[in-house]
Amino acid sequence: MEAVIKVISSACKTYCGKISPSKKEIGAMLSLLQKEGLLMSPSDLYSPGSWDPITAALSQRAMVLGKSGELKTWGLVLGALKAAREEQVTSEQAKFWLGLGGGRVSPPGPECIEKPATERRIDKGEEVGETTAQRDAKMAPEKMATPKTVGTSCYQCGTATGCNCATASAPPPPYVGSGLYPSLAGVGEQQGQGGDTPWGAEQPRAEPGHAGLAPGPALTDWARIREELASTGPPVVAMPVVIKTEGPAWTPLEPKLITRLADTVRTKGLRSPITMAEVEALMSSPLLPHDVTNLMRVILGPAPYALWMDAWGVQLQTVIAAATRDPRHPANGQGRGERTNLDRLKGLADGMVGNPQGQAALLRPGELVAITASALQAFREVARLAEPAGPWADITQGPSESFVDFANRLIKAVEGSDLPPSARAPVIIDCFRQKSQPDIQQLIRAAPSTLTTPGEIIKYVLDRQKIAPLTDQGIAAAMSSAIQPLVMAVVNRERDGQTGSGGRARGLCYTCGSPGHYQAQCPKKRKSGNSRERCQLCDGMGHNAKQCRRRDGNQGQRPGKGLSSGSWPVSEQPAVSLAMTMEHKDRPLVRVILTNTGSHPVKQRSVYITALLDSGADITIISEEDWPTDWPVMEAANPQIHGIGGGIPMRKSRDMIEVGVINRDGSLERPLLLFPAVAMVRGSILGRDCLQGLGLRLTNL
């Protein structure tokens, strides 16, 4: 029952596609048919004579009981059985679909389908039981079924049908007993266990002088493969028979796999990872020389095929050299029989030329393994020669290209190069650090030293991109978080040093201007003329505006607004802006974005620079080092900038530039449009024209 269910399920998947019934539904249908007496054995389902009674009975049951599940399942099974029956045009194909693949799911053969029902029921006792037992033995996945004679002479004695040659035990094939292929242990034994049905003419004859050799495995449906390949385009006459070790016998290759591989080579190329994966899957099991050469004719053009033949010959010569040194080499059959040679490995020895059956019978398992491995290695070499990869050293991340796309191009080029596998990972990581965009380079340099593989670097960059964008604003936000604790530590230390036992912040003395004490505690004891005088700047008592200690630090503020006594604010956490970097203690440096708003075509529309806030400069000056070379400039009315060191030549921007200061959270202040000066100075300067337009004061920084 289980074997029949597997056969029917495979046939339904082949001919019904996605709507094929499940094994559970097929088993329920077979159980119902046996219960109703429509089938004496599950294998009777292959007989066309039982199809009409089953259809009528299930239709009547559906109308009476209203249950159409079994009828629907039977409709799909019936369609698959009819399609399989129509496709069997020769007895060799019938054997394949009968299940000679050793448990491989196969549609029914003509011996079970075309046999009349009256002939099956001559003797309802012993004869029917014998037929059922024979069918169950054919469908068993553990054993190979013995095909019936098709009316031809015996290949051993030459007599007509009915000879007893098959009853005698035949010698095992030459490679039986080898530990390389345990699944082939029962191939030769089945020949002597066929009962009264000898091997027919459809089985391949043994070569002269090798009468005891086992016949070759089942062949692929050549006509079907020709049709499949003809519809896809490649000019191929025939296809190889790929033999794999799946189960107790070798089985032919699916034509759809060959068709898909040919299409992949045309669309993806030979170096594609998809192509290599499919070729390795097809050649994962031993192939005959006939199989290998035909497969390469399909996927390679004339020139690559010629290169492959030469490379294959070199690989086979290496195998022969190793087999010559070691008599027990697997290609020599573990010391049994003659040593291997180039003619045997290429399928050119006596009885092998153009004869895949002879190759399957005469070649040893170790030779098949060497042939397949050499062919695959030669294919890899030809793929590198026929389609050379682009130089990985020239790959650079584009301005608008994502890091993932850049990594894909780089890894593909490095893996397709001639670099040894051990050197590919360090090369990829080094290219990440040098060929990526500047923001990503800075992020990778800050990565932990424990990241040692390309995958870890890629994951690190992607994780950081999710947290904050890889721009100057994002980096500014990250740096602000790191600097904030340092600033707070400095503030708290200064505050603790200037705070008395009462906890009040101690400021400058009104009398002497010294820190650390009040006016009442001043040792000079000098009092102002009017101790109750109110200051016009800070709104404090006991001093005037001229004596105010905040006079130099609050120019331009309205009196009495937002001021408090003491030298530090009362708030617990002072406002810290990343616009001022901490590497210059007394120089207010800010991060600025410059955007060219002109219509002149430029390579980079926006740039990021570091500039100095200088209230002593009349105008904004951009250094020649920070100014992009393709941004247009013009001669200014005043060709020089005058300072303490003398005059410096300058030019002026032809286009209007948008200037924006970056805050610590990555946001921008209100931008300003101006025509900055460009000069050869040591650093860019934001002058009073920019400070007034942006509303910036040095006291706020």
UniProtKB/Swiss-Prot annotation:
<keyword id="KW-0468">Viral matrix protein</keyword>
<dbReference type="InterPro" id="IPR004028">
    <property type="entry name" value="Gag_M"/>
</dbReference>
<dbReference type="InterPro" id="IPR012344">
    <property type="entry name" value="Matrix_HIV/RSV_N"/>
</dbReference>
<keyword id="KW-0862">Zinc</keyword>
<keyword id="KW-0946">Virion</keyword>
<dbReference type="InterPro" id="IPR008916">
    <property type="entry name" value="Retrov_capsid_C"/>
</dbReference>
<dbReference type="Pfam" id="PF02813">
    <property type="entry name" value="Retro_M"/>
</dbReference>
<dbReference type="GO" id="GO:0075523">
    <property type="term" value="P:viral translational frameshifting"/>
</dbReference>
<feature type="site" description="Cleavage; by viral protease p15">
    <location>
        <begin position="479"/>
        <end position="480"/>
    </location>
</feature>
<dbReference type="GO" id="GO:0039660">
    <property type="term" value="F:structural constituent of virion"/>
</dbReference>
<dbReference type="GO" id="GO:0003676">
    <property type="term" value="F:nucleic acid binding"/>
</dbReference>
<feature type="site" description="Involved in capsid protein dimerization upon acidification">
    <location>
        <position position="430"/>
    </location>
</feature>
<feature type="site" description="Involved in capsid protein dimerization upon acidification">
    <location>
        <position position="418"/>
    </location>
</feature>
<feature type="region of interest" description="Involved in capsid protein dimerization">
    <location>
        <begin position="217"/>
        <end position="259"/>
    </location>
</feature>
<feature type="short sequence motif" description="Nuclear export signal">
    <location>
        <begin position="219"/>
        <end position="229"/>
    </location>
</feature>
<dbReference type="InterPro" id="IPR010999">
    <property type="entry name" value="Retrovr_matrix"/>
</dbReference>
<feature type="site" description="Cleavage; by viral protease p15">
    <location>
        <begin position="166"/>
        <end position="167"/>
    </location>
</feature>
<feature type="site" description="Cleavage; by viral protease p15">
    <location>
        <begin position="476"/>
        <end position="477"/>
    </location>
</feature>
<feature type="zinc finger region" description="CCHC-type 1">
    <location>
        <begin position="507"/>
        <end position="524"/>
    </location>
</feature>
<dbReference type="Pfam" id="PF00077">
    <property type="entry name" value="RVP"/>
</dbReference>
<feature type="domain" description="Peptidase A2">
    <location>
        <begin position="609"/>
        <end position="690"/>
    </location>
</feature>
<feature type="region of interest" description="Involved in capsid protein dimerization">
    <location>
        <begin position="290"/>
        <end position="298"/>
    </location>
</feature>
<feature type="site" description="Cleavage; by viral protease p15">
    <location>
        <begin position="239"/>
        <end position="240"/>
    </location>
</feature>
<dbReference type="InterPro" id="IPR001995">
    <property type="entry name" value="Peptidase_A2_cat"/>
</dbReference>
<dbReference type="InterPro" id="IPR050195">
    <property type="entry name" value="Primate_lentivir_Gag_pol-like"/>
</dbReference>
<dbReference type="GO" id="GO:0006508">
    <property type="term" value="P:proteolysis"/>
</dbReference>
<feature type="short sequence motif" description="Nuclear/nucleolar localization signal">
    <location>
        <begin position="524"/>
        <end position="527"/>
    </location>
</feature>
<feature type="region of interest" description="Disordered">
    <location>
        <begin position="544"/>
        <end position="571"/>
    </location>
</feature>
<keyword id="KW-0479">Metal-binding</keyword>
<keyword id="KW-1188">Viral release from host cell</keyword>
<dbReference type="GO" id="GO:0004190">
    <property type="term" value="F:aspartic-type endopeptidase activity"/>
</dbReference>
<keyword id="KW-0863">Zinc-finger</keyword>
<dbReference type="GO" id="GO:0044095">
    <property type="term" value="C:host cell nucleoplasm"/>
</dbReference>
<dbReference type="InterPro" id="IPR021109">
    <property type="entry name" value="Peptidase_aspartic_dom_sf"/>
</dbReference>
<dbReference type="InterPro" id="IPR001878">
    <property type="entry name" value="Znf_CCHC"/>
</dbReference>
<dbReference type="GO" id="GO:0008270">
    <property type="term" value="F:zinc ion binding"/>
</dbReference>
<keyword id="KW-0677">Repeat</keyword>
<keyword id="KW-0645">Protease</keyword>
<dbReference type="GO" id="GO:0019028">
    <property type="term" value="C:viral capsid"/>
</dbReference>
<keyword id="KW-1048">Host nucleus</keyword>
<feature type="site" description="Cleavage; by viral protease p15">
    <location>
        <begin position="155"/>
        <end position="156"/>
    </location>
</feature>
<dbReference type="InterPro" id="IPR034170">
    <property type="entry name" value="Retropepsin-like_cat_dom"/>
</dbReference>
